[in-house]
């Protein structure tokens, strides 16, 4: 691989020449790279929904109907859960609606859609690199490294992180359109500029990471001015070119503010600016480390605020970052190529929204998905560096560069395949995080909940106790311990820990709904229903509260109240199976089987994989005298849950009828 676009005429590399001749065509190179990427991540098609996929996708009524699209533009991503969230991503919700229409709740389809988004972004990176002035093979190498880099595992194989993939695709395309719009050789510059603004709007409506786009435009315009090179004219020109993008960003922020009228402020007000400044070098250095050596990847890094070990956690990272900046400055000055400086600034500016640490919980500052957009700059620098590798005795520069690329690809593919599996299930996600960062209370609490749901109560309690003991300041520790005790049937201990939970959490919508559910599980219906009354007084149309409180009334045999709340939940989310199922059961238990059976039918049709939906539909059929249908539903329930004693008993009883 040489430093020009031409294929070297060297008979020793005849095979490489033939291959290079064909790959020199983007129409062949990009599909081949896309296919390679699909194969690399094909294992994710067998992964389940994990982590935030459950509330954002599986249990989100909004994504189940296109009629909810206007609501997506007027509310936050978690509107159905609470009213004080800060995630405004309507285009991601629209993408989720499309996936639901195409794949229902089949995880493979959602994973395939997320993988296609990554492949599309890879193509956008190639196009961007070319428009930035990189020659063909350097741009191809940038796209290749971006496609295969293991740090992209999280946004590719975790469905909920596809918003990062999508926003990056839109940003890259918007910048390409911006570059085309300022190209003096093009005649349709106005159309390109308009397209650039439209693509920026799409990026902003996908995820907040695009808010720095105007800054990238200004930086590029200053580095490569259209008119004049004196500092004042360059600055004015850069500002003028960035103004339209700034106006689009301001319009987005106003729209976001209107939609998130109930959003709360900063997440962690207990740490000030000094804490943030001391911690930033460590956070940025961790990102740089993972880009350079992508091992030990997880969705649950733990980098708490720097309060001690100043030399190791502040001075050393700051010195390392200083050396990196100095190295890039020297490289840029030696070659006189502003692309080097711009790629470095792309990394920093692209990461900037994720560096406002007070938006996150203590220690939750590093996430691989946040570096997906900034890593375009890294891929460009890596490609430029590889293309400048010199000859070594006995090896031409082309041979050295080709060997380096092969070794890099082998390392990336190996590291990626070895670490993708940790996103296959919730249990693997939490176990990986807790194994790599055993001091992370968030990972301990999450793994505790996972163990508890699987019936490993002793393990769950031990992990929750560890989190409470080692991190008494962590607000969710007592809640996790209380839930673990309650799930284990140790209600007295559960009640003790419920009293130790942060009062601020208890007063929130999610907190009240959680407490109501836990009290209902223990049979403390008076306390549970009092909380239900309080939350529904504040938010009478909150789906999660209507559904949870309707179930509590059902468990307390208050079927009339259960019918009232669950009917409202069904009205708000007609595509959800669960509220219809429990509404049908409430009517069945209340002696109104004829009214309840249609709801039970609809629930089993909407979500045919839930065994007890079929079981209770069978009970309804049996009560109405339809024995063949009852038998069929009991058999389906037993097929889905072979350990169902209830279904076995019902089938045995029907044999004599």
What do the PLM-derived regions correspond to, one by one?
Residues 2-492, 497, 507-510, 514, ...:
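Polytopic membrane enzymes that build or remodel cell-surface glycoconjugates and lipids
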Residues 453, 487, 521, 555-556, ...:
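Register position in tetratricopeptide repeats
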């Amino acid at each position: 691989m040489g430093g020009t676009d031409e294929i070297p005429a060297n008979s020793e590399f005849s095979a490489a020449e033939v291959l290079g001749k064909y790959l020199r065509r983007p129409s062949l190179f990009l599909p081949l790279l896309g296919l390679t990427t699909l194969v690399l991540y094909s294992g994710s098609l067998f992964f389940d929904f994990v982590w935030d996929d459950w509330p954002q996708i599986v249990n989100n009524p909004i994504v189940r109907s296109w009629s909810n699209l206007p609501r997506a533009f007027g509310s936050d991503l978690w509107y159905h859960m609470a009213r004080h969230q800060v995630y405004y991503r309507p285009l991601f919700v629209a993408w989720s609606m499309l996936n639901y229409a195409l794949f229902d709740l089949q995880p493979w389809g959602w994973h395939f859609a997320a993988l296609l988004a990554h492949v599309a972004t890879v193509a956008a990176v190639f196009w961007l690199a070319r428009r930035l002035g990189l020659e063909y093979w350097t741009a191809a190498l940038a796209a290749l490294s971006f496609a295969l880099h293991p740090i992209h595992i999280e946004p590719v194989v975790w469905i909920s992180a596809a918003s990062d993939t999508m926003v990056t695709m839109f940003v890259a395309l918007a910048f390409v359109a911006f570059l085309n719009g300022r190209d003096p050789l093009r005649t349709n510059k106005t159309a390109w500029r308009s397209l650039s603004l439209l693509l920026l709007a799409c990026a902003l409506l996908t995820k907040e990471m695009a808010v720095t786009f105007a800054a990238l435009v200004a930086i590029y315009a200053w580095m490569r001015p259209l008119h004049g090179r004196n500092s004042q004219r360059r600055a004015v020109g850069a500002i003028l070119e960035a103004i339209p993008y700034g106006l689009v960003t301001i319009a987005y922020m106003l729209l976001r503010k209107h939609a998130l009228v109930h959003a709360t402020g900063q997440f962690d007000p207990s740490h000030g600016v000094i804490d943030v400044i001391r911690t930033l070098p460590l956070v940025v250095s961790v990102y740089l480390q993972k880009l350079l050596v992508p091992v030990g990847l997880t969705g649950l890094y733990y980098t708490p605020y720097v309060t001690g070990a100043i030399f190791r956690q502040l001075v050393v990272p700051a010195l390392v970052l200083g050396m990196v900046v100095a190295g890039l400055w020297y490289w840029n000055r030696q070659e006189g190529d502003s692309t080097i400086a711009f790629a470095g600034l792309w990394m920093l500016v692209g990461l900037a929204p994720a560096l406002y640490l007070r938006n996150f919980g203590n220690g939750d500052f590093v996430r691989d998905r946040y570096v997906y957009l900034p890593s375009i700059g890294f891929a460009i620098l890596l490609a430029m560096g590889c293309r400048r590798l010199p000859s070594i005795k006995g090896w031409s520069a082309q041979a050295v560069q080709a060997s380096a690329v092969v070794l890099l690809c082998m390392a990336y593919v190996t590291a990626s395949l070895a670490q993708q599996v940790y996103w296959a299930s919730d249990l693997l996600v939490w176990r990986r995080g807790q194994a790599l960062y055993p001091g992370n209370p968030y990972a301990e609490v999450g793994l505790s909940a996972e163990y508890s749901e699987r019936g490993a109560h002793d393990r769950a309690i031990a992990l929750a106790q560890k989190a409470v003991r080692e991190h008494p300041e962590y607000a969710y520790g007592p809640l996790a311990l209380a839930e673990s005790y309650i799930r284990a049937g140790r209600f007295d201990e559960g009640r003790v820990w419920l009293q130790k939970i942060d009062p601020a959490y208890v007063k929130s919508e999610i907190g009240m709904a959680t407490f109501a559910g836990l009290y209902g599980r223990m049979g403390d219906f008076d306390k549970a229903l009092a909380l239900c009354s309080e939350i529904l007084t504040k938010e009478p149309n909150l789906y999660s509260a209507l559904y949870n409180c309707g179930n509590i009334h059902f468990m307390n045999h208050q079927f009339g109240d259960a019918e009232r709340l669950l009917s409202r939940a069904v009205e708000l989310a007609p595509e959800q199976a669960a509220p219809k199922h429990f509404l049908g059961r409430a009517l069945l238990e209340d002696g109104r089987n004829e009214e309840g059976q249609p709801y039970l039918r609809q629930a089993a049709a909407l979500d045919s994989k839930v065994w007890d939906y079929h079981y209770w539909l069978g009970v309804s059929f049996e009560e109405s005298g339809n024995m063949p249908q009852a038998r069929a539903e009991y058999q389906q329930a037993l097929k889905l849950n072979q350990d169902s004693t209830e279904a076995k008993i019902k089938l045995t009883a029907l044999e004599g009828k």
